[in-house]
Design a protein with these regions (language model features):
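Blade-level signature of beta-propeller repeat domains, shared across WD40, Kelch, NHL, RCC1
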Residues: 246-269
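A short beta-strand motif characteristic of beta-propeller blades
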Residues: 26-33, 65-71, 108-115, 152-164, ...
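Short loop/turn segments that connect beta-strands within beta-propeller blades
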Residues: 61-65, 103-107, 147-150, 192-196, ...
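WD40 beta-propeller blade core
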Residues: 58, 98-100, 142-144, 189-190, ...
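Repeated scaffold domains used in trafficking and secretory/extracellular systems
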Residues: 35-43, 75-83, 119-126, 164-173, ...
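Beta-strand-rich domains and repeat architectures in extracellular enzymes and scaffolds
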Residues: 31-54
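Bacterial Sec-dependent N-terminal signal peptides
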Residues: 1-29, 269
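Conserved beta-propeller blade signature
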Residues: 47-50, 88-91, 132-135, 178-181, ...
């Protein structure tokens, strides 16, 4: 535990030294979606996805026009939505241990029940490269990479060996190089593409985050923070939305800001 604390403090010091605080070009509102939603997501093509109170997934274009919708009452409440691959949207229903994969029109491509394997207890899912999936198995306290046919390709070490406790996963996200695991009420753990533990990032108290071009973006009050896990640089950008912000999602050129009754689409282009 002492070694972990020292590493985390060193990471924090590096961030303080390299924190550039770069002021980006001023963001402007380019569209508004007058729909109440529980969550918002943006892919790298700047498509916007809203999760409604009825567990319906709505897909909009960058101008805020509704294009497609998807709902599924068979598996209960959606635990997570991963739109990092616009052609392969991954939905995870934790209560039923079920994953559903959609195409860009939000039609089902495939689905899989983790309950088929009695040894698994999946608490988080992320989309990987080459149609793979990363999952966190609470039963073995490990990250597992599954192939497109849902067979095991990679398995990390038991994280109990590192943290002396069972890791309580809240969310996972994957980039080309890394996998990030957010612990409930704690920070974000970084792993390499083989499931090897890299470090605990010096950012905590996150309600949500997303990955864009290997950069972690998260909300801090009315500011959008972008953290570069390879250079330790961090930048801050104020979101020009007067209403209380519950979530922000970053795409290629679009930032979607979720408020109680609407979603504001911002851009600096």
């Amino acid at each position: 535990m002492m070694k972990r604390l020292i590493v985390l403090l060193l990471n924090c010091l590096i961030v303080m030294l390299l924190d550039c605080g770069i002021a980006h070009a001023q963001l402007k509102q380019v569209a508004k979606i007058d729909t109440a939603a529980k969550a918002v997501y943006v892919d790298n093509l700047d498509n916007i996805y809203l999760l409604s109170a009825r567990e319906e997934l709505l897909k909009y274009d960058a101008k805020g026009k509704l294009k497609w919708r998807y709902s599924n009452s068979r598996f209960g409440k959606l635990h997570s939505v991963d739109v990092s691959d616009p052609l392969r949207v991954v939905l995870f229903y934790a209560d039923f241990q079920q994953v559903v994969v959609l195409n860009n029109n939000l039609n089902e491509i495939t689905s899989y029940s983790f309950a088929k394997n009695g040894n698994l207890l999946v608490s988080a899912v992320a989309s990987g490269n080459n149609s793979s999936l990363w999952i966190f198995d609470r039963a073995s306290n490990a990250l597992i990479k599954l192939s497109s046919s849902f067979t095991e390709d990679v398995r990390s070490a038991n994280l109990f060996q590192i943290f002396d406790e069972v890791v309580d996963a809240n969310k996972m996200a994957a980039s080309d190089q890394y996998v990030f695991l957010q612990r409930k009420h704690e920070g974000v753990l970084q792993f390499d593409r083989f499931g090897g533990y890299v470090r605990e990032l010096p950012i905590d108290s996150l309600s949500d985050f997303n990955i864009t071009s290997n950069v972690i973006a998260y909300l801090n009050g009315s500011d959008l923070i972008k953290y570069h896990p390879t250079t330790f640089e961090r930048s801050k950008q104020q979101l020009p939305v007067s209403l209380p912000i519950s979530q922000a999602a970053v795409g290629n050129k679009i930032i979607a800001v979720l408020t109680e009754k609407a979603v504001f689409l911002l851009s600096d282009n």
